[in-house]
Amino acid sequence: GLLSGLKKVGKHVAKNVAVSLMDSLKCKISGDC
């Protein structure tokens, strides 16, 4: 249903946010932005 669809989308978004956060963190640490 709608709820499981929303959960799936939420997981996808959370994963993308986590990945981009990690990327910007790596960039700040290593200094190659």
UniProtKB/Swiss-Prot annotation:
<dbReference type="InterPro" id="IPR012521">
    <property type="entry name" value="Antimicrobial_frog_2"/>
</dbReference>
<comment type="similarity">
    <text>Belongs to the frog skin active peptide (FSAP) family. Ranatuerin subfamily.</text>
</comment>
<keyword id="KW-0044">Antibiotic</keyword>
<dbReference type="Pfam" id="PF08023">
    <property type="entry name" value="Antimicrobial_2"/>
</dbReference>
<comment type="function">
    <text>Antibacterial activity against Gram-positive bacterium S.aureus and Gram-negative bacterium E.coli. No activity against C.albicans.</text>
</comment>
<keyword id="KW-1015">Disulfide bond</keyword>
<dbReference type="GO" id="GO:0042742">
    <property type="term" value="P:defense response to bacterium"/>
</dbReference>
<feature type="disulfide bond">
    <location>
        <begin position="27"/>
        <end position="33"/>
    </location>
</feature>
<dbReference type="GO" id="GO:0005576">
    <property type="term" value="C:extracellular region"/>
</dbReference>
<keyword id="KW-0964">Secreted</keyword>
<keyword id="KW-0878">Amphibian defense peptide</keyword>
<protein>
    <recommendedName>
        <fullName>Ranatuerin-1T</fullName>
    </recommendedName>
</protein>
<keyword id="KW-0929">Antimicrobial</keyword>
